[in-house]
Every structure is written in structure tokens, then in C-alpha cells.
Amino acid sequence: MPLNPRPISTALYMDAGLMNGRTYTYDVRRVVPGPLPLEGEGLKGTATPRDRTPPGAPMGVKSERKGKAIAVTWQANMEKDLGGYNVYRIMGSQAVKLNSTPLKETAFLDAAAPDFRFIAYHVTAVDAEGNESEPSQESIIQKE
């Protein structure tokens, strides 16, 4: 059953409404126009769409001192395919990820925070496919 009602004249066809992770098989055929259109033998191909859309950046990132550690908190993202969060400590122009796997909770305690005058943090969201969001706004904490 053809996806397009009439032959197309370009070498591009967009099939919309597909499900990520499901494999689709296509049979592309050349059609010679005429009173009785002739179809050539088809070329088969498969495609499996993937989610490449990252979640939104986390909002409301805050940091506060808790003794020698720094607590970083943020608001939960609402995406249905959210996999977790990454927390980064920013020192100079270098951002270092502090967690090895995405965090499920919306809080992180940086127990190894260096004793600097200023430290900044940002948080990213990661979806189930591993797409990572843009960084949140930085939260900067100043040593008292």
C-alpha cells in the first residue's frame, strides 16, 4: 500500500507520525507515467527513528553552604521521558560533572567542594535516550 497517493518527483519523502525505536520497512519504486503507469522493481530499505530531542534545562537552581559541603537544589523537570540530572561545578572556564550516573532526585551535596571564595554550579537534564539539555542558569555561592 503506497504512502503517497501520487508519484513524487523528488528524491525525498518525509514519513511523519512514527514511533521512536520501532523499525519501519520501505519499498521505493520507480513509476513510469503514461496511460497505464508502469512500476519498476522496488528497492527496500529500513529506518528506525530515534529521539534526539533533549529535555529542557532545569530551572530554579540554588546552592547553599552546609558546613564544608555545598547543597545544590533545583526544580523537577516535567518531561515524561526524563532519565535524571547531571550536576556540574564550574571553576574558571571549566565545568566538571560531579555525578557518575544521572541523579533521580533534585538535590545534590557537593561534599568535596574546594575552599574557594566563589564556586558556581549548573545542572542539566538527561532523557531516557541520553539526550542532555542545555545547562541551567548558574548558581554562584560566595565564601563567607
Language-model region placement:
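Hydrophobic beta-strand residues of extracellular immunoglobulin-like
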Residues: Y13, V61, V72-T73, F108
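Short beta-strand segments within Ig-like beta-sandwich modules, predominantly Fibronectin type-III
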Residues: L3-S9, L98-K104
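Beta-strand-rich modules
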Residues: Y13-P37, D110-E132
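Extracellular fibronectin type III
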Residues: V31-P55, D127-E144
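Short beta-strand elements bearing conserved aromatic residues within extracellular beta-rich modules
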Residues: Y85-V87
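Short beta-strand segments of immunoglobulin-like
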Residues: M59-R65
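Conserved aromatic anchor
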Residues: K68-L82
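Short coil/turn motif common to extracellular beta-sandwich-like domains
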Residues: N20, R65-A71, F118
